[in-house]
Amino acid sequence: MQESLKKMWSGRFSGESSELLEEFNASIGFDKNLYREDIAGSKAHAKMLGACGILKPEEAAAIVAGLDAVLAQIEEGKFEFKTADEDIHMAVEKRLSELIGSELGGRLHTARSRNDQVALDFRLYVLRQNEQIARQIREFIATLTSLASAHLDTLMPGYTHLQHAQPVSLAYHLLAYAFMFKRDFERFISSHERNNLCPLGSAALAGTPHPIRRELVAQELNFAGITQNAMDSVSDRDFALEILFNISVLMTHASRLCEELILWSSQEFGFVTISDAYSTGSSIMPQKKNPDVAELIRGKTGRANGNLIALLTTMKGLPLAYNKDMQEDKEGVFDSVRTATSSLAILNAMMKEAKFNEQNMLAATKKGHLSATDLADYLVREKNVPFRTAHFITGKAVAHAENLGVDLSELDAAQLKSVDENLDENAVKFLNLHASKEARTSAGGTANASVRKQIEELESWLSKSGD
């Protein structure tokens, strides 16, 4: 038989594979990333076959030793991945057979299909990445919490519609992101727990007549249990969709933060100075200092979203059980994982070195009439004015301030009284911006007491989530 026909599945074929097919069909170029998982799964499978008497103990031991040798060759850069090997499973098995002999090497695939093998490999990879990304998220939450602790009294405008809305602290603003990322952490952990089941032993789609014990493989690989239906096991890519979705939401949160860093670092805002270590210059304009890291994270978010939509679209029309379309599941996941891990690493480092310009933030609170809601609330609480009427009166006060060319917080008692008789001298103290921030004592509010509780909650969570 010619070399091109010497494939694990070549017995049924009498013709040669087209070179076009060889290139088009092969996944070895990217699924070689799964070599650790593939070898770990094969070792667990061989041990189980030995424990069940399907292989002799010495055969199982020889296969495991051979797989260790293959792993060492790959990690030492001595393993040549070839397109003709088709995928990582065939590449590893072929090299194993070269090392220990084809008769013994050929026994490894007993009671196993590439369908459940790839389901195992890919699931192991995704579970490992769930843990890695969750660790990085936790580290970033710790950074945000530390920054918040340092900026309890840094006053800045809170925004809606990118317009000045109400005074808040920088600590409060940063904590909003900390709680966003905490939800991201919880999504990755939840997905890990839900998908921590071993599919190996499902074979092609219907299980196997060999007397295997799937739970032994699950235990060897530290799974919580085994999947319950073989057809579902080889068809399932929910775990891949989940990590793509979780990364998309994570990157969306990172993108929103980066958008603000981009705005805040501009001359128009001047709220933050990004370290030179995480900025770049212009090839023509000598004065430029560009927030390229933040812009790249913002841009890479679209890439992560695209990977999610691509796999959703691939999976939506597939009949049970395995289809070759599912080979398209991996590159997007690999790409999104690289995107998420690299983005989190550099975002965390950049935030640690960011310098917030407290005076510029404070100056910005003197624009936009940030105390307007407090004035309306005063009328409701102290003068028993219906809120809609209070809203109207306060709007008139804002218009009066603008006619005078000042901020609402700068109006004196006489100027307020000229707008409406309910705006007496007591109303003036409700225009104080620090007092405005401190007045919001409701749970989750901007008052320092509330913000400290939020910080304490996160610090307590951080101490427990590292277990």
UniProtKB/Swiss-Prot annotation:
It is found in: Cytoplasm. Pathway: Amino-acid biosynthesis; L-arginine biosynthesis; L-arginine from L-ornithine and carbamoyl phosphate: step 3/3. It holds the Pfam family Lyase_1. One of its GO terms (cellular component) is cytosol. The keyword Amino-acid biosynthesis applies. InterPro entries: Arg_succ_lyase_C, Argininosuccinate_lyase, Fumarase/histidase_N, Fumarate_lyase_CS, Fumarate_lyase_fam, Fumarate_lyase_N, L-Aspartase-like. Its main location: cytoplasm. Its EC number is 4.3.2.1. One of its GO terms (molecular function) is argininosuccinate lyase activity. It catalyses: 2-(N(omega)-L-arginino)succinate = fumarate + L-arginine. Keywords: Amino-acid biosynthesis, Arginine biosynthesis, Cytoplasm, Lyase. GO terms for biological process: arginine biosynthetic process via ornithine; L-arginine biosynthetic process. Belongs to the lyase 1 family. Argininosuccinate lyase subfamily. NCBIfam families: argH. This is Argininosuccinate lyase. It comes from Campylobacter curvus (strain 525.92). The gene is argH.
